[in-house]
């Protein structure tokens, strides 16, 4: 009899786990468009607990605490027009940097004087990368590609678009390639690294990932940066730019102390994980983080969704073995015991995900691991009712009938 009950327990644990996953599927599809299902469905979108690891890297307002490579320097062009940018590039180029990456979009011709100055400055650069963009900024494939104005000459280009999901507007990923005018185009940061260290750039391609999760090392306080005025005045250490990657972009106006939101983004480095009011990082600094990640091969390995759901299924199955036994034989205390186990399991799983991310740069999706465990405690009541009905209707045997009557 005991062996028979064990077989029934195993069968019901498996079937109840499948039942939980069928309910999750219904919740996510929400065929009746119920608001409660919308809430549950939205919670299935990965809760970015890994943001905890990045949050706070935006802090610090004193000395630069360099975490981003010393080979990367960011220069603020501020409010300069094309002629002023040309003069700034000339000054930078005199210092013999290895690569100059210009994170500005020069769309269409301007006045002839400014364009001729900028074109001349570009031509003097040994290794130059210019930013381009796709018109829509959500990371989807599209063909509306904006290149540098032809009046400025032909130079190496890479798209500077950042992936900005509509839900929380947080930049976590970048696309490793895209199609523009039927041509394969690589991102701006990749082209910069390719000029500086081709072998490191090639390693990114060999990963064969359409998207890469950005491993943020820090904001302005974690990278060497200068204002354009300081560069023009020579107020920087001698030979400091020589042989380095110099990224020229925008991270503050000389005329307005308030942040300019056009190229200002939310990132996981924001001090507030939830309830954020203001963006925290300028686009050129995000590009510096991407360049740093490619150079150092400090990639984050993201597990495939099927793997996360499979692990989640096994975890839910193991919990159901415990929950069903308590439900049938210790029903009076079932909910109390189950909620304690549920809480401890959720804590351990979140901690494990954060630990793997911090120590091994492995990112698991948290929702597929935790959501089934959170739902199964209450869904067992529905599963029990269903099995009792099937027993009366079809004579189906079940482990739920092996304990004392508790209803």
PLM regions and their residue ranges:
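Non-transmembrane functional regions of envelope-associated proteins
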Residues: 2-207, 241-334, 342-346, 374-383
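General structural signal for secondary-structure boundaries
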Residues: 48-53, 224-230, 282, 304, ...
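A Trp-anchored, charged/polar loop motif used as the substrate-binding/catalytic surface
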Residues: 221-239
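Active-site Gly/Thr loop motif
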Residues: 210-225, 285
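Alpha-helical transmembrane segments forming the membrane-embedded cores
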Residues: 308, 329-407
């Amino acid at each position: 009899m005991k062996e028979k009950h064990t077989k029934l327990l195993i069968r019901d644990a498996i079937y109840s786990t499948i039942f939980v996953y069928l309910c999750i599927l219904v919740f996510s599809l929400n065929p009746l468009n119920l608001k409660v299902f919308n809430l549950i469905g939205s919670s299935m979108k990965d809760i970015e607990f890994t943001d905890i690891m990045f949050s706070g890297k935006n802090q610090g307002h004193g000395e630069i605490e360099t975490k981003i490579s010393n080979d990367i320097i960011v220069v603020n062009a501020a409010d300069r027009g094309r002629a002023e940018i040309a003069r700034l590039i000339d000054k930078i180029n005199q210092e013999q940097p290895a690569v100059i990456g210009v994170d500005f979009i020069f769309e269409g011709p301007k006045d002839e004087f400014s364009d001729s100055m900028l074109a001349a400055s570009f031509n003097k650069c040994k290794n130059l990368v210019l930013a381009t963009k796709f018109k829509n900024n959500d990371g989807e494939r599209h063909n509306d590609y904006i290149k540098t104005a032809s009046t400025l000459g032909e130079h190496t280009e890479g798209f500077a678009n950042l992936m900005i999901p509509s839900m929380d507007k947080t930049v976590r990923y970048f696309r490793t390639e895209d199609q523009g005018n039927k041509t394969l185009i690589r991102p701006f940061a990749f082209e910069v690294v390719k000029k500086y260290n081709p072998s490191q750039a090639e390693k990114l391609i060999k990963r064969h990932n359409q998207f890469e999760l950005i491993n943020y090392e820090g904001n302005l306080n974690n990278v060497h940066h200068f204002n354009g005025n300081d560069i023009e005045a020579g107020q920087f250490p001698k030979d400091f730019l020589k042989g380095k990657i110099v990224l020229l972009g925008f991270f503050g106006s000389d005329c307005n102390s308030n942040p300019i939101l056009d190229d200002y983004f939310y990132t996981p480095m924001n001090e507030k994980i939830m309830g954020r009011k203001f963006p925290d990082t300028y686009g050129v600094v995000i590009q510096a983080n991407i360049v740093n990640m490619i150079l150092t091969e400090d990639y984050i390995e993201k597990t495939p969704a099927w793997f996360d759901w499979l692990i989640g299924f096994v975890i839910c199955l193991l919990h159901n073995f415990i929950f069903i036994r308590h439900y049938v034989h210790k029903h009076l205390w079932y909910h109390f015991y189950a909620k304690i186990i549920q809480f401890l399991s959720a804590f351990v799983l979140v901690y494990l995900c954060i630990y793997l991310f911090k120590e091994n740069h492995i990112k698991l999706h948290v929702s597929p691991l935790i959501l089934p465990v959170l739902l199964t405690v209450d869904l067992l009541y529905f599963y029990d009712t269903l099995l009792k009905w099937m027993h009366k209707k079809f004579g189906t045997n079940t482990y739920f009938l092996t304990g004392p009557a508790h209803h």
